[in-house]
Design a protein with these regions (language model features):
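N-proximal low-complexity "stem/linker" segments adjacent to membrane-targeting elements
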Residues: 1-46, 50
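C-terminal catalytic/acceptor-binding lobe
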Residues: 3-9, 141-210
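Residue-level recognition of beta-strand->loop/alpha-helix junctions
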Residues: 41-44, 95, 179
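Active-site nucleotide-sugar/metal-binding loop of Leloir-type enzymes
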Residues: 53-66
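Conserved catalytic core of nucleotide-sugar-dependent glycosyltransferases
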Residues: 56, 77-151
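Short beta-strand-to-loop acidic/aromatic patch adjacent to the donor-nucleotide binding site
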Residues: 64-75
């Protein structure tokens, strides 16, 4: 007999609004995942760590097997949830670039990768949570709050996603990144466009005088 399909909570930390491109990608994901028992969670908070913790609590009340965190400034393929589930890992996701130059890739791969490759999976020391699937059993091994900010030895702030990764690895969990999927998702940003110089004004004036 086939095992039942997992129950999945999709948690989206956000403010009062989300990007239109994200909303479209989210709708397409839900359509592609309609055979699953889904719970859609919008956790509004100006404190992202609190939003993630609230999402975990709501997922637990739903009886979810997994929680998928999606940030509201991401775009992704419709099949992303099924593809992450097929990896059968406790913590697996995709990474992406920062939205400001020099557009560094977020997360830290382990220096020593497994001797037996796992397809497109790369084992990570840390991974961002903008597109991350987590087994609910992970939270049974962690004390609350599951997500929180911290500081390093030099006083720099460590984000709630990296602190979670550190604690999960200390609890014995491995963290994986789907390298192929990471090339398919996008981090929505914003640019300001300006005229290159003021010369166009003089050119326009001369054109009017002719």
């Amino acid at each position: 007999m086939d095992s039942p399909l997992p129950r999945v909570s999709i948690a989206v930390p956000s403010g009062d609004m989300v990007h239109a491109d994200f909303a479209l990608a989210y709708a397409q994901l839900c359509m592609a995942s309609s055979k699953l028992q889904l719970q859609l969670i919008t956790v509004k908070s100006s404190i992202v760590a609190q939003a993630r913790n609230n999402g975990v609590d709501l997922a637990r009340n739903f009886g979810a097997d997994f929680i998928l965190f999606l940030d509201s400034d991401m775009v992704f393929p419709p099949t992303i949830l099924f593809r992450l589930l097929l990896h059968r890992q406790d913590i697996v996701g995709a990474t992406y670039a920062k939205r400001v130059p020099p557009f560094e890739i977020l997360g830290t791969p382990l220096a020593e990768q497994p001797t037996v490759p796992s397809g497109d999976l790369v084992e990570m020391q840390r991974i961002p949570t903008g597109c991350l699937l987590i087994s609910m059993g992970v939270f049974d091994k962690l004390s609350k709050p599951y997500f929180r900010f911290d500081t390093d030895a030099e006083g720099a702030i460590i984000g709630e996603d990296y602190v979670f990764c550190d604690r999960a690895r200390e609890a014995g969990f491995r963290i994986w990144c789907d390298a192929a999927m990471s090339r398919e998702i996008g981090h929505i940003g914003q640019n300001i466009y300006r005229l290159p110089d003021a010369g166009w004004y003089g050119t326009a004036r001369r054109g009017q005088s002719q």
